[in-house]
Amino acid sequence: MTVTPRTGSRIEELLARSGRFFIPGEISADLRTVTRRGGRDGDVFYRDRWSHDKVVRSTHGVNCTGSCSWKIYVKDDIITWETQETDYPSVGPDRPEYEPRGCPRGAAFSWYTYSPTRVRHPYARGVLVEMYREAKARLGDPVAAWADIQADPRRRRRYQRARGKGGLVRVSWAEATEMIAAAHVHTISTYGPDRVAGFSPIPAMSMVSHAAGSRFVELIGGVMTSFYDWYADLPVASPQVFGDQTDVPESGDWWDVVWQCASVLLTYPNSRQLGTAEELLAHIDGPAADLLGRTVSELRRADPLTAATRYVDTFDLRGRATLYLTYWTAGDTRNRGREMLAFAQTYRSTDVAPPRGETPDFLPVVLEFAATVDPEAGRRLLSGYRVPIAALCNALTEAALPYAHTVAAVCRTGDMMGELFWTVVPYVTMTIVAVGSWWRYRYDKFGWTTRSSQLYESRLLRIASPMFHFGILVVIVGHGIGLVIPQSWTQAAGLSEGAYHVQAVVLGSIAGITTLAGVTLLIYRRRTRGPVFMATTVNDKVMYLVLVAAIVAGLGATALGSGVVGEAYNYRETVSVWFRSVWVLQPRGDLMAEAPLYYQIHVLIGLALFALWPFTRLVHAFSAPIGYLFRPYIIYRSREELVLTRPRRRGW
């Protein structure tokens, strides 16, 4: 072994070597390392505590539904510890994700499993067991033995008073079930089956156990009570304060219940329709539930024959309020078959056969699919036809039909109205810009460029105008790159997403601040210079306010979306895709509806600015002398300077 000598002084070497008297271990020849053996005994406990041979997926069943997935760490077939599993499939960007799964009870399940107090045998009150065995030996019949005990008030009071005082003894499973059966038979034969009441010990119990017990009570004619009918503790506050009905569903389940209820109400009226809808409505509340409840109330008041004929007149005999979604977009053309095929393929992709009795685009069928089979795929189908669904709602509302409330409830699920807004408003803005610009040029050509204020004041203008115009040009170019060029293109060019956003934030912030400073000076000039202020129209004043708001909102979106303040957000995956989809006439309003609020505010202000554009002095942008850059050369002949008796006056 080659030893590297130390380069320190003699005193330093002596001090280093003297350390062997104080530090246990072997010092290397170069005095640079110390090797110790042992001293890690304290780590053994932790290594053994968290060691395991394998990891299995399981759940726990201590007063629980067993719906939470746990990772169970096992060593030598013994549970050592457990952690929550987090690989639940996503429900998609349009729906609330599952609430966190796993509670402290589950985290301590191994304690329950190996607890010395774990119940491993059937137990019964010792006093009652003695009386039952004596009566059965004397009478020879289990039911007669139980009846004999109940007929004697003294013996009955004796075992009842023993409750809560211990005195439990082990009994066999056969004897325990025999005593339970004898008690049920005696109670039913003496008082009737309705004197037998069943309930769950806690709402969060095994669904198999609850189903078996409730089915047994129903088969013998007993009464199945709800958990809140007897459990007078904290959970009762939930239904009293929030209006929840017994067990509370997750937020995502509310949409499923609304879709299921709407599917029931939009089908042909039958005797079970309203009862099923009311049963579903018992589990949800809120505006959507109120709308569905209004439909149920109006149909409940109507005569069955009247409701049936009104349904036929509304949906079967009139195309203006049809429930077949593709008819709204394709009409009676061959394209409708192609669109219906998309519905059928969606159903088959989830291993569900398309309906045979109805076409796959029938709205109740789509709602049923979204509620019970694949919420994400159903959500996409409903979002793709949000405009026809909104038109159907308007048609039913104009006709004052009760089904309008149901369709309105469907529109409220998720952000369908928001999707419709971001689908329609861009085209409304484009129409205003096109028609308004034509009108302005046709009827106000003189005012197109004559409202310039350059003649009134030029000192501030020479400073503010370049700042604003050069800044806004950089902002426009940046918006064009971010909105028009797909993210995949910049990545293919070797520009990573992180590098792109850094450049966008830096350059965009500088350009935005420059633009804001320039427009601030322009507004100050217009307000403080009398002639300039007099030449400013009301529309221009509103335009300046909207313009400043758009710039401020853009700077805010840049800061918030970049992660400088708050969590970073990649707008190129939603806002940019929405922008491009608008121009190819395939608007994805759902993407814009998913964007954060600060992006929505910025885009909304921008659309308002474009809507004001034709009616303000911003139209001078259309008169920019672009042709001046490509003008032909002008040939002229120089002339000798004239000798005058007095200096020439400047022309400006």
From Swiss-Prot:
The UniProt annotation places heme b 1 binding at: 469, 620
Main localization of the protein? membrane
List GO terms (cellular component aspect): membrane; nitrate reductase complex; plasma membrane
Q: Which residues form each disulfide bond in the chain?
A: none
**Cross-referenced InterPro entries:** DMSO/NO3_reduct_chaperone, Heme-iron_electron_transfer, Mopterin_OxRdtase, Mopterin_OxRdtase_4Fe-4S_dom, MopterinOxRdtase_cofactor_BS, NarG-like_domain, NarG-like_sf, Nitrate_red_gam
| PROSITE patterns in alphabetical order | 4FE4S_MOW_BIS_MGD (PS51669), MOLYBDOPTERIN_PROK_1 (PS00551)
Name of protein: Nitrate reductase-like protein NarX
Q: Which organism is it from?
A: Mycobacterium tuberculosis (strain ATCC 25618 / H37Rv)
Q: Which gene encodes it?
A: narX
